[in-house]
């Protein structure tokens, strides 16, 4: 199973979450995602931090949906090393982010 969120959106969260002064922007961006995208973002972060293996992505996604009790933006912004977890999750899932990273600041 592959994540049903655009790589560009995940890269947006990665880049913005590295800038402490932009935490409000990241929070608003995550809040603006639909519920499916939010669950996929959480599942990618969980794979990245080692809570789930890449081959267990479907289980991570299901868990993200069923255990969502805190607003997703609050949960993710409170996660230590969010950017690194998302990067590691994308890498574990064999998702190439080169194009999304190159175009990030072109917008």
Give the residues covered by each predicted segment.
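Surface-exposed polar/charged interaction patches
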Residues: 16-20, 36, 67, 96
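Structural motif
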Residues: 3, 28-39, 80-81
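Short terminal alpha-helical segments
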Residues: 2-24
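Short, hydrophobic/amphipathic alpha-helical patches that form generic packing surfaces
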Residues: 39-49
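Helix-rich interaction surfaces within compact, conserved domain-sized segments
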Residues: 67-107
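Noncatalytic partner-interaction/assembly domains of nucleic-acid and motor enzyme complexes
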Residues: 22-31, 51, 71-77
């Amino acid at each position: 199973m592959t994540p049903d969120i655009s790589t560009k959106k995940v890269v947006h969260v990665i880049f913005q979450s590295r800038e402490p002064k932009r935490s409000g922007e990241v929070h608003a961006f995550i809040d603006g995602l639909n519920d499916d995208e939010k669950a996929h973002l959480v599942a990618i972060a969980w794979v990245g931090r080692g809570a789930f293996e890449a081959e267990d992505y479907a289980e991570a996604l299901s868990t993200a949906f069923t255990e969502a009790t805190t607003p997703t933006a609050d949960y993710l912004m409170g996660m230590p090393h969010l950017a690194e977890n998302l990067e590691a999750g994308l890498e574990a899932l064999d998702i190439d982010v080169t194009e999304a990273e190159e175009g990030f600041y072109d917008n």
